[in-house]
C-alpha cells in the first residue's frame, strides 16, 4: 500500500478551506439580491459558480450556511472596515484631546461620524445592506445573537473614549445612544438614498444627538 503524500493532504485541505470560504461569501450576494429567505443551496451554488453538490457537501444544513456566512461577514467587516477606520481616527482623537478644547473635540467627533456614515452609504452600500440583514436575522435566530452582541460591544468600545474625553456622566450609554442614531441615519440613507437628502443632513442629525447627550 502506497503512503499518502503529506503535502498533497495539506494542499487538499487548503483547497477545501478556500472553497468553503468562497461558498460562504457567495451567500452574501444572495442575501443582497434576495434577502435571507433567498439563501438556498442551489442559489448559493449559482452565485459561487460551483456544483450544487459542493454546497451540500460543506453545508448540509442551510441554516448552518447562513449562520457561518453571517459570522464571517461580521468578523471581516470589523477587521477590514470598522477597525481600520477607527485606528486612523485615533491619531485625530489624540491631537484634539491634547488641545483640551471641548468644542474642537465635539466638532472632530461629528466630522468623523459624517465621514464614516457617508462612506458606508456611498461606497459600501452592499456591505451595509448585509449588515442590516444580519441584525434582522438575529432577532429570530439565537445562533446569531452572540455575534451581533460582540459586534455591538466592539463598536461601543471604539466610540467610548470620545465620550470619556467629553466627560459625560455615562460614556457607555452615550456610545449606545449615538450608535442608535448612526443606525437610524444609515437606514434612512439606504431607503431614501444618501444623495437625495438635503445637504448636511447627516451632520445635522449627529450634532443634534451629541447635544442631547449633555
List PLM regions with ranges:
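Conserved alpha-helical segments that form or flank metal/cofactor-binding pockets of metalloenzymes
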Residues: 64-94
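Helix-turn-helix
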Residues: 22, 26, 30-68, 72
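Hydrophobic/aromatic-rich alpha-helical bundle segments in the mid-to-C-terminal region
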Residues: 145-153, 162-214
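N-terminal intrinsically disordered/low-complexity leader segments
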Residues: 1-18, 29, 89-93
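Solvent-exposed, amphipathic alpha-helical segments
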Residues: 22, 26-34, 80, 130, ...
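Amphipathic alpha-helical packing segments from all-alpha helical-bundle domains
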Residues: 121-132, 136-166, 176
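Hydrophobic alpha-helical connector segments
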Residues: 82-124, 178
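Amphipathic, non-transmembrane alpha-helical scaffold segments
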Residues: 16, 70, 74, 145-153
